[in-house]
From Swiss-Prot:
Keywords: Cell cycle, Cell division
A GO BP entry: cell division
Presence of keyword Cell cycle: yes
NCBIfam families given in the database record: minE, PRK00296.1
Keyword Cell division on entry: yes
Disulfide bonds: none
Protein task: Prevents the cell division inhibition by proteins MinC and MinD at internal division sites while permitting inhibition at polar sites. This ensures cell division at the proper site by restricting the formation of a division septum at the midpoint of the long axis of the cell.
Protein name as it appears in the record: Cell division topological specificity factor
Similarity comment text for this entry: Belongs to the MinE family.
Gene name as annotated: minE
Source organism (scientific name): Wigglesworthia glossinidia brevipalpis
Lineage: Bacteria, Pseudomonadati, Pseudomonadota, Gammaproteobacteria, Enterobacterales
Amino acid sequence: MALLKFFISKKEITSDIAKERLQIIVSEQRKNSKEPNYLPMLKKDLIKVIKKYINLNSETLCVKLDHKNKKNIKIFELNIVFPEKNFLNKK
């Protein structure tokens, strides 16, 4: 029985260690990421809203988030290239 407990407890400890390591890796990747997690979803939502009013190619939309270290300010920048032909109102 003692031998069985030894092997069972070893598996539990190993899985806990693996889980902890994975959590550390994920948290480090999030810290090092310059782009917030919500930015891709925000870009998709903006494209949907803009497409309601004009014909727009998704590739002409540029979304960027800058971080100013001096004042700890985040700046959200949105650039859209509107072709002259596609300024037709869709409503």
